Amino acid sequence: MSKVGFHISAGGRRGLGDCLKQCAEAGNPLPVIFSVDQDIWPDLARYSPQTVYIFRTQKNLRNQELGDGPGSMYSGDPAKTARDWMKEMMPMWAKNRAHYYAPLNEQDPAQIEGFTWLNAFMSECLNIAEANGYKLALYAFSGGNPKDVLQPASGRPFTRDDSWRELIPSLQRAKANGHILLLHEYGFDFETLKNSMPYLALRYRHAYRLLAQYNADPPLVISEASAGVGFAGISPRAWLDDVKWYDSEIMKDRAVIGCCLYQLGGAENFVKLLPNLADYISQTPTPPPASGDAPVVPGPDLDAQGQPVADDFVFIATADTTPAH
């Protein structure tokens, strides 16, 4: 079935229930929904109980803004920071039922030591979550990250593979104990996801070929996905065509649960396209994963020398130019 799901934030989502119902009754339920401080569980329980649901909060019980991560990221003791952060998160999680909970959003270290810190932080988050009966959705790196930082402002150069290697212990634990990984993929200045492949779209395949060697490849959700920076500034037809192309690719990969189109709600609201998306998702058959027993299919992400494509350029590429290596 289709692997297209939705990212949902505050704003109009009229028609969501009808969409969920149509897809579920057709035997092709939405694979996944990610929400930010929106209670979607009742809709899923009523219309689409098979849908995987991920929740993230930006507030604590005192209605104070928490943001995307703790203020002591990378500087404080990672275990203590995790304990303090989870103490703020979990009371909100207890009020919002979900299958998985995301403790971080788009924390992208500028130095390799930051990934070492993140691994220790997330390992303690996993300790606390498991002791309290929660499953986590880890990391949620932004589009194009982790990336090669070959000329850092300070510290030593490192590649995306170096970054992933620092995270292997927490990802091994995640896979072993039923947690998942989140990543974001956008077209950015390439405009469409299709044009951005493999520099932005489908870059997870490179990571998963590496992580699988260490049994550190948990199930994956692309929790934000869209042409551009979300459904805005691009024609509906072009955006939908890009969604269908992206879906045709991620359906090939066994590791991918699904993607969450950005977004239902907010300034990028695609609510007017819900009927179109419902028709597409409900009518899309289920192909066998082309990756077979492997987590992902092979992908063209190597340069002429057989090295990973450097991606210092990923945020500055023009819309109609394929970057030089």
Give the location of each predicted region.
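Boundary/entry segment of secreted carbohydrate-active catalytic domains
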Residues: 1-38, 261, 317
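Aromatic-rich peripheral "rim/lid" segments of glycoside hydrolase catalytic domains that contact
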Residues: 5, 20-24, 49-54, 232-324
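Short, acidic/polar
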Residues: 11-25, 78-93, 159-167, 243-247
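Distinct, well-ordered alpha-helical segments
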Residues: 16-20, 44-45, 145-174, 200-210
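Acidic (Asp/Glu)-rich catalytic clusters
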Residues: 19-27, 40-55, 89-97, 130, ...
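Substrate-binding cleft of extracellular glycoside hydrolase catalytic domains
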Residues: 40-162, 189, 235
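Aromatic- and acid-rich polysaccharide-binding/catalytic face
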Residues: 51, 55-65, 105, 140, ...
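Aromatic-lined carbohydrate-recognition surfaces of secreted/lumenal glycan-active proteins
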Residues: 130-160, 214-230, 255-266
